[in-house]
Amino acid sequence: PPKKGLYFGGDRPEPSKDRHVYKVLAFDAQSGSKLWEKDVHQGPPTTSIHLKNTYASETPVTDGSRVYAYFGNLGLFCLDMDGHELWTKRFEANPTRYGWGTAASPILHEGRLYIVNDNDKNSSLTALDASTGEEIWRINRDEPSNWATPYIWKHADRTELVTPGRNKVRSYDLNGKPLWQLGGMSSIVIPTPFAKHGLLYVTSGYVGDKIRPLFAIRPGASGDISLKEDETSNQFVAWYQA
């Protein structure tokens, strides 16, 4: 059974009152020597985190000219390759499930940054101009806290932005228009989808759940493609296992 403290927040029910320094560091890939270090924010956290989480769990992304570091409900920081700050986009801090914090990383595609920020309130999906940080579009999401990084799925029919979630796995076009949705995930959604062999694979799992679903999805889906009870496949779900 789940161990209290390890899975349910442990000794961190409230934000730390200590000053935290949020940093971006660059290292030489060949030697491992530090190239530069940039402090982007200092101050006590406004939200708590899970015992196994950090305030810097999100993975930075780069286009080779700029690096984008996202610190969940704190904000997004754009630096040049020498560590100079180019722009900053701050985000409102929202409550997460049991105060566990955030973890979903930004993704970069054709000059846009896509950020999913699923909390226990004010969940959203946002597209930003990568060069300026200006908001291109933003949609609200009917989702509780999730921790899965979105995935850009390119196939012969179109390019999709796939966002796993506890309520639904949802796919959007690059302008935020919903394409399809799929129910049946576990209570905690963390893994990033991926595509191979002409299919998209989406999964989630938690030690306290009875099912840990894995779906293989065909391209071209539309509408609600959720499986009915006792189904393991349909027109757009190639196969499923729990």
Identify the meaning behind each predicted range.
Residues 1-242:
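Noncatalytic, solvent-exposed loop/strand surfaces
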